Amino acid sequence: MKRGALAVVLVISLVVAACDGSAVDSTTAPSAALVGELLVSAAASLTDAFAEVEAAFEAANPGVDVVLNLGASSGLREQILEGAPADVFASANTSNMDQVVEAGEASDPAIFVTNLLQIAVPAGNPAGITGLEDFAREELLIGLCAEDVPCGQFALEALANAGVTPSIDTNEPDVRALLTKVEAGELDAGITYVTDVLSTGGTVGGVDIPEDDNVIAAYPIVALTNAPNPAAAAAFVDFVLSAGGQEILARYGFVAP
């Protein structure tokens, strides 16, 4: 073979080898794992369920540290609109989520569970509460959530459906604060969610509200537009919507939409 032809063959061989090497590297390189802190702002009624969701998600993604920010949905909404860092927002109603979307902080939220209201009473129901009509009895100590939070809005809607004008002694900042007062015997009754009564393991009793008067609370979730950790935020939302996430939520009394 002539010297010039040999040189051409060697150059071609080196180019092919280089291409083959780069192809192998690109196909065998591992995909980046989810890492970092994940800030989840969630309604107070999700406290127990999301604690288990957090543990399950972290077990599947050991590089992620989920930080739950729990409270009234209206307060969480304000935090987000005022620029507080958050990756995921899970609200106990659609109106707070709608305001976040309208402000350009999120898009395409998904309803992931529903919930129903229930009258919460101290263990043994010492005041003998039988229904919403008892909320008009001035001699009883009655509590609701504040009117600007979902559980308060839904409670007033249920009372209106039943034609009851309530005699209210306290309005609590979120559903867990109301539940705590009922559990301590400081109130004869309050209106919470079915899931909150269930979470006490029997230290709070529940009186059902008739279907015609009750209100279905739809819970939306979304990865926020300005999420500091967008990849983990999207993965967390996907997990909540997955069969595994729904199984966890069902154990706490939530119902799939």
Please tell me what each predicted stretch does.
Residues 13-18:
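C-terminal motif of bacterial Sec signal peptides marking the signal peptidase cleavage site
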Residues 19-59, 65, 74, 78-81, ...:
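Exported/periplasmic ABC-transporter solute-binding proteins
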Residues 1-8:
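Bacterial N-terminal signal peptides that target proteins for export
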